[in-house]
Design a protein with these regions (language model features):
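Aromatic "clamp/platform" in nucleotide-sugar-dependent glycosyltransferases that forms part
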Residues: 323
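Donor nucleotide-sugar binding/catalytic pocket of nucleotide-sugar-dependent glycosyltransferases
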Residues: 38, 56-57, 160-163, 181-225
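Nucleotide-activated donor-binding/catalytic signature segment of Leloir-type glycosyltransferases, i.e.
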Residues: 280-312
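Conserved donor-binding/catalytic core segment of Leloir-type glycosyltransferases
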Residues: 191, 223, 228-247, 253-256, ...
């Protein structure tokens, strides 16, 4: 394969999309030339890319100069904008899901962003002198996928990954993801992070796409050398997420307040976000008066630093309380270190928290439900607890090991490129 055009939201800038860190080095070796187009225009570069790669930033927000150019872009792409609008409305009507006025506005904004990104990609390729044998790879089934669906280059293919926030419409704030199905059907392949995501899209489209594939992400377990793990008599609980409403860390705080145990507890949360101050205050009110209970908000940790923490410290339980997920990389990381997991049964979570590795909670669980599970894991005897730890590590090794998963992904990608670059077919 000659050229990879990888379209991301963050990578290699900022702290987002840390899960690309494990994939990128594996796939980068298979291409002569790599172009990364990131939609992060403000953060510093935090990840390494191969020295031969070209990295471009694309600003998805409209500046004054961009706003002034907008009428020209709309006129130049009017037929494309009209086609996409008609296709989306037609599809939604067939699905008996007529778009509202609000959704039409969201659709138009998304179409214009897709057209603008498409034009930007074409300019980048012209600058780089590339016009054929390209793998267009959007890391999300969002704007990047919409943009590449509109491109047509000789001996080239278009692929996208699909996770959670980019496919589960009902769980978004607007309840609507414009061009979702249009773009999914115009890729040579869509790689879903979970079986649940693939099944969801197939039900929505009412078509079993021949290029709809399940391709689990994976995590690497770095070799930190000989280390002595910290010893403590405390039962240590870890959670790891952005501090935003859908992660529902408040429910975990209430569960910790409710849990009854004679054993000292320590809860550590890794991650930051808009609710941090509010959640720290709530934790102080509810947990500071609880005997034998300590907690710390650790803030943002770089991915490698978090894994180093797991390697060097005793962690007894990992908890995820999200209302919606794809298939969380944070759980893969915990399992790679043999940490039992409690998580909500949403999205593809049940594909990783399988029997013998932890416990699933209903999405609408009560704090008391989680408290009982915490008490259960605290009360496990050493033999049963070690069995769960062993199961967790084996599950990671068999299903979520980055080395094997991304090697398999490359094999599939080579096959699709060989077939797709000759007939330029999409999924429809």
């Amino acid at each position: 394969m000659k050229t990879l055009v990888l379209i991301t939201s963050q990578f290699p800038f900022g702290s987002g999309e840390s899960f690309i860190d494990s994939e990128y080095p594996v796939i980068a070796r298979s291409f002569e030339q790599i172009i990364v187009i990131s939609q992060n225009v403000s953060s510093e570069k935090t990840r390494k890319v191969v020295t031969s790669a070209s990295v471009y930033r694309y600003n998805t927000t409209t500046s004054l100069s961009g706003f002034l150019r907008l009428p020209i872009q709309v006129l130049a792409n009017f037929s494309t904008i009209q086609m996409l609008t008609n296709e989306e409305i037609s599809f939604r009507r067939k699905a008996e899901n007529h778009p509202s006025i609000k959704n039409l506005y969201i659709l138009l904004k998304k179409i214009i962003k897709a057209v603008q990104l498409k034009d930007f990609i074409k300019k980048v390729l012209a600058k780089e002198g590339i016009n054929e044998s390209i793998v267009f790879y959007s890391y999300w089934l969002k704007t990047g996928a919409h943009a590449i669906s509109l491109l047509d280059y000789k001996n080239s293919i278009k692929i996208a990954r699909a996770h959670g926030s980019d496919i589960y419409e009902e769980k978004t704030e607007a309840g609507y993801l414009p061009l979702l199905c249009y773009s999914a059907l115009r890729m040579n392949a869509v790689f879903f992070a979970s079986r649940d995501g693939k099944d969801y899209i197939e039900r929505k489209i009412k078509v079993k796409g021949r290029g709809f594939l399940v391709s689990y992400l994976g995590v690497t377990k770095p070799d930190f050398g000989e280390t002595k793990r910290s010893e403590t008599d405390k039962f240590v609980i870890v959670s790891c997420s952005n501090l935003i409403p859908l992660k529902r860390i408040d429910l975990l705080i209430k569960a910790l307040e409710t849990a009854k145990t004679e054993k000292p507890l320590e809860w550590l949360h890794f991650g930051d976000g808009i609710l941090r101050n509010e959640l720290e205050e709530e934790a102080s009110l509810r947990l500071n008066t609880k005997n034998k209970m300590n907690f710390r908000f650790m803030g943002h940790y770089a991915n490698n630093e978090l894994l180093k923490f797991y390697n060097r410290n005793k962690v007894d339980l990992f908890i995820n309380t999200s209302s919606t997920e794809g298939l969380p990389v944070s759980i893969m990381e915990a399992q790679s270190y043999g940490i039992p997991v409690i998580a909500t049964d949403t999205g593809g979570v049940r594909e990783i928290v399988v029997e013998g590795t932890g416990s699933l909670l209903p999405v609408n669980f009560l704090p008391a439900d989680l408290a009982k599970l915490i008490e259960y894991y605290i009360g496990l005897n050493e033999e049963n607890y070690k069995a769960i730890k062993g199961n967790a590590i084996r599950n990671w090794e068999s299903n979520f090991n980055a080395a094997s998963n991304y090697r398999d992904f490359l094999i599939k990608l080579n096959s699709i490129f060989t077939a797709g670059s000759t007939d330029s077919s999409s999924l429809i």
